């Protein structure tokens, strides 16, 4: 395993006292999807498995015979997301990342306070306010716009996602008096145990000056120290997904500067395979849809590709090692390796 990048898990150490807590957090992450999938231990530590409670012996087909359309395993809204930082976002909903078309201009919404953020609907505007914008809005004294400028210049989006995570945690403490629905679920995700690069210190300096100065509660402010920031960045490093909204496009986990980016809690448990049985796509907005590529039997692990499966063995493995810290040993890679050696 790469000494620079190691996949680690906050829940590696398990005992009888922590199991009920972990099971409860998994339940909150699964939500209604517990009827379809389950999180289980596997050779890659943990994975997501097809487990249809209401039809425990039924294979999931690629095409739904009733609608003659591709089947849907489940869909998930992101914990946080952010649009492209190199494309114009003037006509992009700041919440769901959907394009606001000219004919929809009349229903377009904006924040009355900052006049900066635009939304495609009242629903998106309200969700944004409840989840994070009430904390990040310029009218509250937040300096999130300075963090956005920094991220745009340096071409680094993770600090922006970290800012939204901070906002969601503050809103969680404000509305629920706990971190049950915010920080605890994030602790279940794998993270890259890598030495913090020097630029993370620069990012945190801007981050703290932009966002922490507005927090009056000193005990809460201390929660968001540099160690917290590093852990968040490590989580984002392994778990973010590129968002390319296109009803006809299949996506991999990797993002490009042109794409949006998001963190999805349940989807983060899906392991990689170079010959996956499922794929992610974004037909409408930032809501992730998971559909089968091949029939999936009850008990099968659901896998997606983190990289372009049309690339050759060397390119696939190099990309996966560089970005996710593992040497892929799926059946496709082992078979390709055998063919390569026999040539």
UniProtKB/Swiss-Prot annotation:
Top EC class for this record: transferase
GO molecular-function term, one example from the UniProt record: zinc ion binding
Signal peptide segment: none
Domain (SET) ranges: 77-307
UniProt superkingdom: Eukaryota
InterPro entries with a match to the protein in the record: SET_dom, SET_dom_sf, Znf_MYND
Zinc finger residue ranges, MYND-type: 93-137
Entry binding sites for Zn(2+) 1: 93, 96, 120, 124
GO biological process: methylation
Cellular component terms (Gene Ontology): nucleus
One Pfam short name: SET
Keywords from the named record: Metal-binding, Methyltransferase, S-adenosyl-L-methionine, Transferase, Zinc, Zinc-finger
Keyword Transferase: yes
E.C. numbers: 2.1.1.-
Entry binding sites for Zn(2+) 2: 111, 114, 133, 137
Record's function text: Probable methyltransferase.
Family: Belongs to the class V-like SAM-binding methyltransferase superfamily.
Protein name: SET and MYND domain-containing protein DDB_G0292454
Organism: Dictyostelium discoideum
């Amino acid at each position: 395993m790469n000494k620079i990048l190691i996949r680690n898990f906050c829940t590696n150490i398990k005992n009888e006292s922590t199991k009920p807590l972990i099971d409860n957090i998994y339940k909150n992450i699964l939500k209604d999807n517990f009827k379809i999938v389950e999180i289980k231990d596997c050779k890659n530590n943990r994975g997501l498995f097809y487990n249809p409670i209401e039809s425990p012996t039924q294979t999931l087909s690629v095409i739904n015979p009733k609608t003659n359309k591709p089947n849907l395993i489940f869909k998930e809204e992101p914990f946080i997301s952010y649009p492209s930082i190199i494309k114009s976002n003037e006509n992009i909903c700041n919440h769901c990342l959907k394009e606001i078309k000219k004919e929809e201009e009349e229903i377009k919404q904006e924040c009355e306070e900052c006049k900066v953020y635009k939304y495609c609907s009242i629903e998106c505007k309200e969700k944004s306010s409840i989840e994070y914008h009430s904390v990040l809005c310029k009218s509250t004294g937040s300096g999130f716009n300075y963090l956005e400028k920094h991220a745009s210049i340096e071409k680094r989006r993770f600090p922006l996602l970290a800012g939204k995570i901070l906002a969601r945690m503050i809103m969680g403490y404000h509305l629920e008096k706990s971190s049950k629905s915010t920080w605890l679920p994030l602790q279940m995700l794998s993270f890259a145990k890598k030495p913090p690069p020097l630029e993370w210190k620069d990012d945190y300096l801007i981050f703290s000056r932009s966002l922490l100065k507005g927090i009056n509660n000193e005990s809460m402010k201390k929660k968001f120290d540099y160690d917290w920031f590093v852990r968040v960045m490590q989580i984002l490093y392994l778990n973010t997904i590129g968002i390319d909204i296109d009803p006809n496009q299949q996506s991999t986990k990797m993002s490009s500067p042109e794409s949006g980016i998001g963190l999805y809690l349940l989807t983060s448990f899906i392991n990689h395979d170079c010959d996956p049985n499922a794929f992610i796509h974004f037909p409408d907005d930032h809501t992730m849809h998971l559909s089968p590529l091949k029939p999936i039997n009850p008990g099968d692990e659901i896998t997606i590709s983190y990289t372009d499966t049309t690339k050759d063995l060397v390119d696939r493995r190099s990309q996966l090692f560089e970005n996710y810290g593992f040497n892929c040993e799926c059946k496709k890679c082992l078979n390709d390796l055998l063919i390569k050696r026999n040539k």
